[in-house]
């Protein structure tokens, strides 16, 4: 039996984490196995990328293209290491952000062509969708 992948999208402070925690508790109370994750993050590489982008001086002033590719690298690892295996095992994966955030933050806000963002995202996620 395949699992389920649910993503929560929205701006900072809109309640994504609160809703994820509530749904996770409800699903677990129903006997479901739930994996909670976030982007960037969820793997050692993802957490490193998160730290680089948010806290490291090397992440300051990064070009939009470099930022997009770091998110894509993190996502590729995340899908292959955590998300796809959990779904294959019948687990429910709840993710704080995924593709839509990249489309908005790197595509729209950083003015990268949406077709390029989509192509890179699709390459990163492979057959997950």
Predicted regions: what is each one?
Residues 23, 27-28:
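Hydrophobic alpha-helical packing residues
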Residues 1-3:
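Phosphate-binding P-loop
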Residues 16:
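Conserved lysine of the Walker
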Residues 30-125:
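ATP-dependent small-molecule kinase phosphotransfer cores
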Residues 6-8:
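Hydrophobic anchor at the beta1->P-loop junction of P-loop NTPases
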């Amino acid at each position: 039996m395949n699992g389920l992948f649910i993503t929560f999208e929205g701006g900072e402070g809109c309640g994504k984490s609160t809703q994820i925690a509530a749904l996770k508790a409800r699903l677990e109370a129903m006997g479901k196995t739930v994996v909670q994750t976030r982007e960037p993050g969820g793997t050692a590489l993802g957490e490193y990328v998160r730290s680089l982008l948010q806290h490291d001086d090397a992440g300051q002033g990064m070009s939009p293209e470099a930022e997009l590719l770091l998110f894509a690298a993190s996502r590729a690892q995340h899908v292959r290491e955590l998300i796809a295996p959990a779904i294959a095992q019948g687990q429910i994966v709840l993710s704080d952000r995924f593709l839509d955030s990249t489309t908005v933050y790197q595509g729209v806000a950083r003015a990268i062509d949406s077709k390029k963002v989509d192509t890179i995202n699709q390459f990163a996620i492979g057959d997950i969708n």
